[in-house]
C-alpha cells in the first residue's frame, strides 16, 4: 500500500495578484503639538484669546469648546465664531474645534442611542464637518466623557467614520482620552 501521494518536497507557489494595498494617509505634524483648551459658554470673537495667551510661549494649537451634542439624532449646538478663528490664525495658531458631550446642560443625550445609530453618527459627522468648513477650523478635537461600556464599540465606530471624512478633507482629528473609572 502506498501511503505517499507523490514526491515530497518544497513547492514554489506564485502569488501573483493585481491587488495593490491602499496607502493609509494621515495628517501628521513634524513638530510637537502644544495645545491649550478654551471653555466657552457663548460665542467669543477672539479678543480674550490674545489676552489669555499673553506671556505664554510654544503654544501652536488652541481648542475652543464650540460644539455640543444637542440630541440623539446627531445635531449639535454650535457657538463658533469666525472672528475667533481668524484671530487665532493671525496669531499663528491652528484651531481645533472641540466637540463635547457633557457641557450642554439642556441637552438630553444618551451616548448609546446616539452612537449606535448609523444615521445619527452620519448626521453628527456631517454637522461637524460642515461647521469646521464654514468657520475655517483646522481640526476637530473630540472630548466625549463618561462614555459607558455599552456605548464603547459604537464610540470607536464613530471615531473611525469621522476619521475617514477628516482625512479625506485634510482636517486634523484629535481625541481626548480619559482614564477609565468606575461610575
Task: Label the model's feature ranges.
Residues 28-43, 68-183:
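Chitinase-like catalytic core of GlcNAc-active glycosidases
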Amino acid at each position: 500500500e502506498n501511503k505517499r501521494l507523490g514526491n515530497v518536497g518544497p513547492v514554489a507557489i506564485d502569488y501573483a495578484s493585481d491587488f495593490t494595498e491602499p496607502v493609509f494617509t494621515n495628517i501628521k505634524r513634524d513638530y510637537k503639538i502644544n495645545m491649550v483648551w478654551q471653555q466657552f459658554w457663548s460665542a467669543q470673537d477672539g479678543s480674550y484669546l490674545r489676552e489669555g495667551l499673553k506671556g505664554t510661549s510654544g503654544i501652536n494649537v488652541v481648542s475652543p469648546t464650540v460644539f455640543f451634542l444637542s440630541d440623539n439624532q446627531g445635531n449639535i449646538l454650535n457657538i463658533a465664531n469666525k472672528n475667533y478663528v481668524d484671530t487665532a490664525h493671525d496669531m499663528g495658531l491652528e484651531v481645533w474645534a472641540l466637540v463635547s458631550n457633557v457641557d450642554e446642560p439642556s441637552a438630553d443625550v444618551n451616548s448609546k442611542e446616539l452612537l449606535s445609530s448609523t444615521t445619527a453618527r452620519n448626521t453628527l459627522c456631517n454637522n461637524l464637518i460642515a461647521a469646521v468648513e464654514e468657520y475655517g477650523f483646522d481640526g476637530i478635537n473630540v472630548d466625549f466623557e463618561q462614555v459607558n461600556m455599552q456605548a464603547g464599540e459604537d464610540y470607536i465606530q464613530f471615531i473611525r467614520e469621522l476619521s475617514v471624512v477628516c482625512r479625506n478633507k485634510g482636517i486634523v482629528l484629535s481625541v481626548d482620552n480619559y482614564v477609565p473609572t468606575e461610575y
